[in-house]
């Protein structure tokens, strides 16, 4: 099926969509740009996903980044070097499940905005998080802005 412009996988690459999705998305794009977070991760094919690029974020939303790594241990050491000095830095290894391979999960804050990096041996655009975001984007497109606001309201109330 052909999707309207803006709903294809290419439309979600980089920070362009993030910068225009919402005020918090613009803040997130600015932080990613100023601190060169995606440039630092360029060898791992980073993709920003989640509620921020969709414009359905709430105050507690974080920046979610998917990465593709061939060696989890090496990526963990890289992350320690690259992000270890950021506030709240943590890193853990997540065991494989029936649906997702083993992963390294990195969390830290940058200017008060939480960032989570999920790195596994699968290309970012093939990971469930990216596919899930595309499905959400298409549902939001079909259902319209009113539906998106209802989703945000539900997220606010837990």
Listing of model-derived features with the role each one plays in the protein:
Residues 1-49:
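Helical scaffold of the NTase/Pol beta-like nucleotidyltransferase catalytic core
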Residues 16, 20-34, 69-111:
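Metal-dependent nucleotidyltransferase catalytic core
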Residues 35-74:
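Active-site nucleotide-donor binding segment shared across nucleotidyl transfer reactions
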Residues 42, 97, 127-130:
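Hydrophobic N-terminal alpha-helices or hydrophobic patches in metabolic proteins across all domains
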Residues 46, 86, 115:
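Hydrophobic anchor at the start of a short beta-strand
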Residues 78-82, 121, 131-133:
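"Short basic amphipathic alpha-helical interaction patches in structured regions
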Residues 105, 109, 113-118, 125-126:
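A eukaryotic "domain-to-IDR transition" signal
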Residues 123-158:
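Catalytic cores of NTP-dependent nucleotidyl/adenyl transfer enzymes across multiple folds
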């Amino acid at each position: 099926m052909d999707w309207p412009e803006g709903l294809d996988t290419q439309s979600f690459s980089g920070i362009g969509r993030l910068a225009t999705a919402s005020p918090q998305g613009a803040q997130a794009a600015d932080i990613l740009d100023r601190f060169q977070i995606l440039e630092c991760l360029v060898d791992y094919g980073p993709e920003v996903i989640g509620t921020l690029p969709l414009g359905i974020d709430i105050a507690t939303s974080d920046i979610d980044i998917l990465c593709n790594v061939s060696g989890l241990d090496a990526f963990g050491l890289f992350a320690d070097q690259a992000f270890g000095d950021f506030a709240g830095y943590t890193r853990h290894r997540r065991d494989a499940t029936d649906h997702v391979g083993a992963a390294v999960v990195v969390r830290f804050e940058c200017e008060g905005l939480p960032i989570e990096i999920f790195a596994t041996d699968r290309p970012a655009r093939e990971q469930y998080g990216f596919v899930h975001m595309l499905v959400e984007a298409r549902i939001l497109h079909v259902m319209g802005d009113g539906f998106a606001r209802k989703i945000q309201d539900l997220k606010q109330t837990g």
